[in-house]
């Protein structure tokens, strides 16, 4: 059996030792390096972390959300997925329609002030409940703009209409697998100012060789402790799904990062993680009866023999 997370652990250690301390947009501060790469051989297993529990259900529902072309958190909340809550909540509390307690810089304040954290959690709970109960409210405040689902499946054309990049790349893999243009891009400069969070995953490129499908992701910004473990599992799952539709076997996931950073308030968690011995990586099971990515439901995707250490909690920087 293989332990596939070692490149991730090595990169964490390198950033802690060699990284540059910097200020950042969130006010939290980071330690980072610029330009890093990890490689994961998907034929040996599935590279989800074992040194801490990573909730695979959240990864499945988020990826299916992207592949639906959805940009509204309502679908995620229906699957008890709160990954994107903070960005939608930020839109709500900064709007003229919000008249509740002051939520300025709620991410940092909730870490430093226990009383405020309780107020923040109550406001977030009310927000989530209203998104689920009030469709008009969800349309207005649950939408995150042109994030991944929109860019992947509904890239707006200047002359009108849209491009479905995912379907295009699947068609190209089937017809011209040797192509060097098997690319999906999420970065549209025109949309960046209006997006809740400009795409961190700028583009990814597929590569076919000897019956195997690989992908390389370029990620402009990577939150190494919280975000990147999700990204590794999500794109590894994406490769497997598209490989099944195109009749190929999974090859490699190559993860290239621009600003690879650890937030200052994650240092203790990273140190704890690095003391843990990884287990063998699990295997991925996909329902063999599903032949198109649109057909997959949550129950069609499972991990087999996922043994892991306990959860390590850390705050999200917004």
Curated annotation (Swiss-Prot):
Alphabetized, the UniProt keywords read: Cytoplasm, Methyltransferase, Nucleotide biosynthesis, Transferase
Annotated positions binding (6R)-5,10-methylene-5,6,7,8-tetrahydrofolate? 223, 317
Q: Which domain of life is it from?
A: Bacteria
| SUPFAM superfamilies referenced in this protein's UniProt entry, alphabetically | Thymidylate synthase/dCMP hydroxymethylase
The residues responsible for catalysis, as annotated, are 200 (nucleophile)
Supply the InterPro entries for this chain.
Thymidate_synth/dCMP_Mease, Thymidate_synth/dCMP_Mease_dom, Thymidate_synth/dCMP_Mease_sf, Thymidylate_synthase, Thymidylate_synthase_AS
Question: Known catalysed reaction(s)?
Answer: dUMP + (6R)-5,10-methylene-5,6,7,8-tetrahydrofolate = 7,8-dihydrofolate + dTMP
Question: So, what pathway does this thing act in?
Answer: Pyrimidine metabolism; dTTP biosynthesis
Write out the GO MF terms: thymidylate synthase activity
Family according to the record? Belongs to the thymidylate synthase family. Bacterial-type ThyA subfamily.
| NCBIfam families assigned to the protein according to its UniProt record, in alphabetical order | PRK01827.1-2 (NF002496), thym_sym (TIGR03284)
Question: What is the protein name given in its UniProt record?
Answer: Thymidylate synthase
Name the lineage.
Bacteria, Bacillati, Bacillota, Bacilli, Lactobacillales
